[in-house]
């Protein structure tokens, strides 16, 4: 346990680190300038950690350019001879983590989906209809 003398002792303060100035607009000027410098340093440190992501709607000059490669494809027509067509395709980015799944063309011979079938609405009417409002009968009589 601590002795009673150690409990009662208070550590001495180093007064050199404190700035004592008279109150008023000029009195706290040193304190404000020091805190402003610290805030600037913190802002500069934060700016270094910010990464800007590309925006889809950004102008082309700010967007990353995709490289294009030339590919030759055979076009076969029954009536004409085989032709070669050169097209420009964007190269696949290897760094990209997200990519769209490959699009598979559907054969025309396959059966259409159930959603594409013709929709038929069946309306069931009760045998006895509800009575019409009283004013519709008076309008029918006058007309």
Swiss-Prot record:
Organism: Bacillus subtilis (strain 168)
Biased composition regions of type Acidic residues, renumbered to the chain: 77-93, 103-115
Biased composition (Basic and acidic residues): 34-46, 61-76
Region (Disordered): 1-143
Name this protein carries in UniProt: Uncharacterized protein YtxO
Domain of life per record: Bacteria
Gene designation per UniProt: ytxO
